[in-house]
Every structure is written in structure tokens, then in C-alpha cells.
Amino acid sequence: MANLGADFGVVGNVPANSSARGRAFGLEFLAQQKLYKGLYGILAYTLVRSEFSDKNGNPVPSSWDARHILSLTAGYKFKRNWELGVRFRFVDGQPYTPYDTVTSSIKSVWDITQMGISDLNRLNSERIPAYHQLDLRVDKVWYFNKWSLNLYLDIQNIYNFKSTTRPFLTVQEDQNGNPITNPNDSNRYLLQSLPNTAGTVLPTIGIIVDF
């Protein structure tokens, strides 16, 4: 069940069976630059493999098999209590199972599930594109006798990267919102695949007061 990731559901599921086997292995690398002449940073890289056995006992990538994960956090302290920080993240494309469009289009199936049925004969055979994001933050601190004031500007996803996940599978609808029947088979609906993207620039202004 854990391998289903965000696709976990209850409609049509069979009793849980612990007969499958899985394994995960990899390599981690970390380098740190402690504060030196105003500069600091941490670089972390992970090479990972995560897989489990399918219904035929063959190893396939798990939903968490991202392969390459990179994280870089760095900053510089300027004079007069100004500070600039950046963070970059990269996660390689993760596997997902494509839809069984033949089964999903059957009216009696769709009317019950209201969603696409995964094709377990092609378990985790596709991958979403890699995800990456760059964040930027600027801080200015004023120190007083018994307290300090920190004003900051934080901009996440500064270059507005649009991440892509498993596409949506849905039925085509007419202008009244009713499902359209396949003209070549009255027992099926017409389906359509819609892109599933997310991501936007997120600026934040904040104030921190320390006593």
C-alpha cells in the first residue's frame, strides 16, 4: 500500500498481502562550508534506488525511486547586518503507473470509481519529469539594547518552475456537463488525459522581533 503513494484508495482494493519484497539502497554525500569571510553553505547529494517485486515477482521501481536528489543551501553575510541566502533543490523524476484506459472507459467501472484505473501490468513503468526549484531570501537586522528587529524578503520558486505529476484521466463532457458516450461503443465513455502541473512564484515579506 505504501508504494501507491498519493494514489491510495479503497474502491475495488483487495485484502492486503505481505508477499511482496522490497529493498532500498544508495549513497549520500554532504559537504559543508562553515562561516568563512561571510560565506557559508551546505551541499547534499543522494543517489538512491528503491524497488519492490510486482505480482510476478519481478523487481520494479517503487514510487519513491527518485534516483538523484540534490540540495544546495548557501548564504553571504554583508556589512551592516545584511544577509543573502539561496536554496536550490533538485529531485529526479519519480515512477508512476499509467492508466488502463480500456478498463477505465467502461461505464459501469467509471460510474463506481469516478477515476482512472491503474494498469498494473505496467506498474511504475513511466516517470514524471524532474523537479527543481530556486529560493532566494534577503534579511536585514537592526540590533537595539534589549531587542532586535529582522525584516526579510523571501521569494520561493524564483524562476517560476512548473512541476508535472501524473496526468488526470477524466471523461469528456458535453456542454451540459454530462459524460459523452463513445460513438463506437455504447458501453464506454470517451476519456481525455489532462496535464497536471503546479508551481508559482511565492514572495513573502516578514518581520521577526526578538527580545
How would you label these PLM feature ranges?
Residues 2-93:
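Gram-negative outer-membrane beta-barrel transporters
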Residues 9-16, 53-57, 116-123, 186-192:
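Extracytoplasmic loops and strand-loop junctions of Gram-negative outer membrane beta-barrel proteins
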Residues 11, 19-24, 62-66, 124-133, ...:
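Short sequence motifs at beta-strands and strand-loop junctions characteristic
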Residues 25-29, 68-74, 132-138, 201-207:
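Hydrophobic, lipid-facing positions within transmembrane beta-strands of outer-membrane proteins
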Residues 41, 90-113, 129-133, 140-211:
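C-terminal beta-signal and adjacent terminal beta-strands/loops
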Residues 51, 70, 82, 102-105, ...:
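A generic structural signal for solvent-exposed, polar alpha-helical segments
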Residues 59-60, 120-127, 137-140, 192-194:
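Active-site rim elements
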